[in-house]
Structures are given as structure tokens and as C-alpha cells.
């Protein structure tokens, strides 16, 4: 009973941290590592920005250019991992997710400031070679903005502390009932 309550507290803390990352732009979980399976078959990691999180449904959203590698990779294999780390709290969340949908929302795109719209309006595809940073051309009429939506299937919570690190795993198939695992 004691450990079950402790596990519930850890899961609630994970949700609280993710919600805080949406509210507070300086929260460490705002930027996180997204890892997909590359088209060649190996891991492909990059930093992305958390744009949405629903603590009841365990769904997440990010924005990207629809021509990016991550979109191609997720279309081939919808599994991915998110790695969140807070250096001050010594807290890590490793979240296994599946892509559940993508939305090309003109409304969300138009709500962005021009400086943010640039991230989705380059005429060159992401990853293509250019001479220099000034050689990027933009076409604001032709945005490639897309919102990717994910559903969590597993969460690992790791808190580095003394005398004992805390590590727990929660899985959708167990109705998010967690278990402690060796750190």
C-alpha cells in the first residue's frame, strides 16, 4: 500500500512537470530529445519543443516541417521515444510513444509570429546542404507546418537522489499502475 501510494505520487509528479513545461518557457522539459528509427534502421535523435500535453490521455504534440526526416521516419514506424531531463531536479523521464496523427493546421500556423513561421517556410527541405545560414529562402504563402500527435505507452521515471535513486516504470497495458525497477 505504501509503495503503491509512492508510485502514484511519482506518476503525478511526471504529469505535473510536463504541464509546467507548457506554462513556463524556461522549464527544462520544454525542450526534449525525440528519438525515431532512421530510414537506415538506426536511432535518430533530435531536440524538439513540447507544444501540447494532455495529462488525462497521456498525449503529446510537437510542431515540425512536414518534409523533415522525422515525419518520413514516423510514417514508416510510428514508435518513438521522448527523453526529458531536468538538471536542477536530477529528474529524467523516458517516454515511449506512438504517433497517433498529424494535422496540417492553417489556423495554428497563422497564429505563430513571423519569426516562428520561418521554421516551417524554408523553400529548401530540412537537411539539404546550403552555402551558409543566410542562404535560406522563405515562402510564407507555402508553409510546411504540421502538428504531430503522440500517445504514451510507457513512462520511466528516474530521480537521482541519496541514499537511493528512485526509478519506476508505468505502462498503458497495466492501466498506468507502476512498479519500481532497479536504477
What is the predicted role of each segment?
Residues 91-183:
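Charged, gly/pro-rich active-site loop segments
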Residues 51-89:
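A short mixed-secondary-structure module that forms the rim of ligand-binding clefts
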Residues 5-57:
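An N-terminal domain-cap segment
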Residues 36-40, 84-88, 159, 172:
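Short acidic, glycine-rich loop/turn motifs
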Residues 37, 65, 85, 151-153:
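Structured loops at beta-to-helix junctions and adjacent beta-edge loops in soluble globular domains
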Residues 30-32, 46, 78, 143-146, ...:
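Short beta-strand or tight-loop elements
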Residues 43-44, 73-76, 160-163:
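Short glycine/proline-enriched turns and hinge-like loops at secondary-structure junctions
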Amino acid at each position: 500500500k505504501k509503495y503503491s501510494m509512492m508510485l502514484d505520487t511519482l506518476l503525478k509528479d511526471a504529469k505535473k512537470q510536463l504541464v509546467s513545461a507548457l506554462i513556463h518557457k524556461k522549464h527544462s522539459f520544454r525542450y526534449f530529445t525525440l528519438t525515431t528509427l532512421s530510414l537506415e534502421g538506426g536511432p535518430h535523435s533530435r531536440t524538439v519543443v513540447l507544444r501540447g500535453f494532455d495529462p488525462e490521455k497521456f498525449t503529446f504534440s510537437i510542431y515540425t516541417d512536414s518534409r523533415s526526416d522525422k515525419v518520413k521516419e514516423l510514417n514508416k514506424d510510428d514508435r518513438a521515444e521522448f527523453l526529458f531531463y531536468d538538471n536542477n531536479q536530477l529528474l529524467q523521464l523516458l517516454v515511449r510513444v506512438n504517433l497517433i496523427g498529424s494535422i496540417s493546421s492553417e489556423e495554428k500556423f497563422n497564429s505563430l509570429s513571423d519569426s516562428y513561421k520561418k521554421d516551417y517556410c524554408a523553400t529548401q527541405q530540412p537537411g539539404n546542404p546550403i552555402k551558409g545560414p543566410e542562404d535560406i529562402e522563405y515562402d510564407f504563402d507555402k508553409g510546411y507546418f504540421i502538428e504531430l500527435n503522440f500517445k504514451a505507452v510507457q513512462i520511466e521515471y528516474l530521480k537521482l537522489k541519496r541514499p537511493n535513486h528512485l526509478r519506476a516504470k508505468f505502462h498503458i497495458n497495466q492501466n498506468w499502475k507502476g512498479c519500481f525497477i532497479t536504477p
